[in-house]
């Protein structure tokens, strides 16, 4: 989600001047002189033109055959000629004016014919919104403007959306203005539900940047605070971790862990595996036939052929292996491939589809049930991800000196080791945890994911983590490590292209794709995530061992605000600013 600091705009921006009389006059249609709507007059005159022309052509053919002079006309023919000329004048005037207006009108005037002309010519308009977004319309721009009268065109569209005549999802394509579409959809939502969402910002966001790739049917955007923890000294480099969160103490705690790591010489990391997976499921008439395909896919002699077919999907996609499992006559095929700096779900799905099409030639009785059979496994806790890994498999470790444990973390090595064994290892086993042998890895993973434009839902498997603490150097120092087998991140595609998220990636030095070493930016981001988890685990376990958790959360993570009165005060202040 895009996070912007300044949402409010000046009253001048929210209340654009009324159209000049000359511009309003330029929008006059040829059918405005008639009492019927334009589409009805167009239909009538088009039918009159066609009928008159057909009648005259038929009569003239009859006169030629009977050698009757063409200039000898009766009353019916005179009426037909009159209708032909009148309809021709109307149609030429209507389409002529529309053509001239399409040339001389500015980009902001293209929306005036929405209801009359449909979606013609508006498909390319959203791409221009980034260059210059139009001023928000009245009523939709701010809460203070709500009681004012809407522009007539917008009022008609809102009414059509509320009545179900115009689908809400089609507004961007028909209007060619993503900001205006969001405002109209927002007003329609208010009228349908009877509830105000004025606390949800509308202005200050580039809606064209999410069209067709990040979010559908937008009505605003959510603001989240972004804190910075660090520096995290990792592999000899310093990183400042952007964390989008609403949980008090989280950034401060991670920051303390970063300090302890830095004062102990830093942390090191290693990427064990880099492969995104997709597992389609196919059904066969018999289990024997399913086993035959399983044997074919797992035969090393066939790997090169499968690789050629799979790798056609992208210049970055490289097939690494195929792992199969059977359930009756159903075959689950787990394809693994490298995906460069992209998270890679779309890339691997395309490659899998190529292979399935190829296999269909030799296995005609294969019935592909789904491109995803949950053996992948995406956005779900699973043993296959915990054991085999998915995305980037990373181990991050550090040795924390005895003095740092005492001065920075306010505890001792023995207490930390004992707590980790009883809580993270034994306690998680008692709970039957799957990949949850840690204190709060998900906190750090999710905060960094949201800040850097990753898929927050993939926090499920990306937070799989086992935290290990051991005494070293005769028990004086502490060795801490986190092993995370399935960190699913990318530095291109999806939400990474949004301005705020792109800025956070730039802060880490991993924005975009690496030209020299494809995939290195995504791998570096994965190690930074693991390093942040290492710092967060170290600090939280220390707080638990020292008995500081409740005290710190009551101080920094407990709201004492009267929300209702605060909201009312903020609304009053906003109205005063608007006035």
Curated annotation (Swiss-Prot):
Database matches in PROSITE patterns = HMG_COA_REDUCTASE_1, HMG_COA_REDUCTASE_2, HMG_COA_REDUCTASE_3, HMG_COA_REDUCTASE_4
Kindly provide the name given to this protein in its UniProt entry: 3-hydroxy-3-methylglutaryl-coenzyme A reductase
GO annotation terms (biological process): coenzyme A metabolic process; isoprenoid biosynthetic process; sterol biosynthetic process
The record's subcellular location field reads: Endoplasmic reticulum membrane
- Molecular function as annotated in GO: hydroxymethylglutaryl-CoA reductase (NADPH) activity
Source organism of this protein record: Zea mays (Maize)
Q: Does the keyword Electron transport apply?
A: no
Q: A Pfam family name for this chain?
A: HMG-CoA_red
Q: What is the lineage of its organism?
A: Eukaryota, Viridiplantae, Streptophyta, Embryophyta, Tracheophyta
